[in-house]
Amino acid sequence: MTGNILIKPSVQQKFDSVMQSGRILFFSAPCGFGKTALANALLCGHRTLRLCADAPDFTLRTLPENWDVLLIDDFQLLQEQETSQTLCELIRANPTRRFVFLSRGVPPSYLTAFQYTGLMTTLEPDDLLFDREDIRGFFAARKAAVTESEINGILKESIGYPLGGAVTARCMSGGKPFAPEIVAQAYREVFSYFEDAIYRRFDLPVRHFLLDLAPFERFDLEMARMVSGDPRTGNLLDWLLHNTTMLRYDDVRHFHFWPQFRAFLLWEMEKECSEEKRRAVFSRGALYYELKEDYAHALECYTKSGDHAKISELLIRNSELHPGMGHYSEMEKYYRALPESEILASPSLMQGMSMLCALAMDYEGSERWYGALKDFADCRKKQDPAARQARSRLAWLDISLPQRGVEGLIKTIPAVFRLLTDKEITLPSFSVTSTLPSIMNGGKDFSEWSKKDDLLYRTLRTPVEAVLKKDGVGLADCAVAESKFEKGENITKRILALIPQVSEIQQKGTPDIEFAVNGLLARCQLAKGQAADARRTIETLRARFEAQGLTRFLPNMDAMLCRMALHCDDPDSADEWYRTKAPRDPMHLNVMKRYQYLTQAMVEIEQSRPDAALLTLSPLERYIQGCGRHIDGIHLNILCAL
C-alpha cells in the first residue's frame, strides 16, 4: 500500500522486472481499474514525463531531455500511423529509458514485436482485480472495519473491480455495515461514472449496438448482425475489441462483455429503451437461437419478448428431441406454464409432458398424460394424420418411459417394428444411453437380458436397429459385448471386432453409441490395469466432442474421469471434480445426473464423509426402485454399506 493506493505484489513484481530489464509496461484495462493512480504510485521516485493522448498539444516529435520514464495516458486514442512510427522509433532509440502506456484498449499490433521479444509486459484486467486479501488491506488502510462475511459480500458484488471496492469503502464510511442499500448506492455511483466516462463518449451507432447486445451473455458475429440489424457489425466489433477492453473473446468466434459493463448496459437499456424496443431485441435474439436449434435459449428470449405462440410452437418442435439431451428438464418451466387445453390439443406436447413427469418421478402424472394421448388417438379415425402422430408418440413412450422397465420390450419392439414396416407410424429419435457411457445401464437397465443375451442378439437385432434408426448403428454389438463384460467374461475379441465399427457409428450413427463404445473400451482397459490408456480414451473423445459442440456428454465424461482418478489413487483430481463439477444439490434430484450422483458419493466416501455420501444417495432410492435400475441399485447398496 502506497498512500491510499493498493499495489498488488504481482503488479509490483512486473513493474520491477520492466524497470530492470524490459522496455514497456502496458496497462490494458477498462476505466475504473485505477490505471493512472497505480502508475503514478509505481513511478514515484522516477523522473517521469507524463503525456495524455487526448491533449490538444500532444506530440512525440519534440520532447524534453530530462526524463527516464515516458508515461502516455489514454493510449487507445493514438490512431495515426505517423504517431505510431514515431513512437516505435523513440523506443528503439532510447534503450535505457522506460515507457508506460495506459490504455482502455488492447496493445496495438505495432507493439507486438516488443511483446514477442520480451521487452513489453502487459497488465490486463485480471492482474488488477482485487482479491479477498486486497479488499481486507484496502479497507484496513482506510481504517474501516469489515468482517469476513462482509469481505465475501463485497468481493461477490464487485467481482474485485477496484472502483467498485473504492466506492463501497466510501459508502461504508462512518461505520455503516455492508447491506443491500450500500450495494445499490455503489452500483448507482459506478454506473453513473460509466455513463459519463465511457458511454456518452461513444458515437450513437456504437451506443445502439451495445444496448442491442447487452441482454445476451455470449454472442458471435452472426448473432450480433441479426440482433442489431447493423450491416457494419464486423467493423463495430473490431473497433470495440481494439479500442476498449469491455468486449472479450470467449474463443476465436464468440464474445462476451466484461460483467460489470454488461450490468451497466442493462441498466442503461432500462432507462433508454421502450418496452417495445426491448421486446423486439429479444425477439430477434430468439430467432437466432431458434435457427441454431438452441431451443432453451430461444424459449427464454421468446418469453421475454411476450411471443407465447412461438413458445408453444417451439415446445412441440423440441419434443422431437430425446430426453438424453436433457432438454426436458431444461424446459420444464415452459411446459408447466402451458394451459392444459393447449397440451391436450397436441400429441407432441402430451408426449413431452408424459416424459417430463416421468423424469420428475411423477409416474402417476406420466401415466395420466399417456392415457390422454391414447384417448386422443382412439377418438379419431385410423387414417387421420393426427391419430397416426399420436400412435407414433405412444409407441415412442412405450419404449422410452423409464418406469416401464424392459420386461415388455421383447414384445413391444417387434410390434413397433411391424407398425413401422407397414408405415402406420413414424418414430421420433430415441436416447438409448441418456448420455451415459453404457447401453446395459443407459436409458434403461437391460441387466435382465444378460441371461439370454446371445438369443436376444440373434432375434432382436434387426427390429431394434430398424426401430432405433441412427441409434441402432453399432448398438447390438456394443450391448452384447458389455453384457459379457458385466458377467466377467473375456471380451478382448469382441472389443477388437467392435472398434472397426466406430467409423461407421461416427458417419451413420449417434454420439451416444460412440460414447458407449469408448466407455466400454475404457472400462476394459482399466480392468486390465491400463489406467493411462483408459484415461486417454475418454480424454481424447471428450476433446473431440467439446470441439463438435456435443457438450451434453461432458458432465458424465468428467464423472467417469473422476472415477478413474479414484481407481488410480489420485484424490487431488477427484477433489477438483467434486469442488467444481459435482451436482451437490440433494434437495433437487435430476435423474439424468444419476451417474454423477453415484460418483459424488464415491468421492465423499474417499474423503471420509459417510454422512454426506448417504445424503447424496438417499434421493436415488425411489427412482432406482420405481424404474427397475438393478445395476444402479447394486452400486447404491455397496456405497451405502461402505
Describe each region flagged by the PLM.
Residues 212, 280, 313, 348, ...:
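Residue register of alpha-helical TPR repeats
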Residues 32, 39, 116, 121-122, ...:
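Amphipathic alpha-helical "lid/sensor" segments that cap RecA-like P-loop NTPase cores
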Residues 342-517, 524:
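Internal alpha-solenoid helical repeat scaffolds
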Residues 149, 191-271, 280:
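C-terminal boundary/linker of central alpha/beta nucleotide-binding cores
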Residues 275-349, 356, 365-369:
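Extended alpha-helical scaffolding segments used for macromolecular assembly and cargo binding
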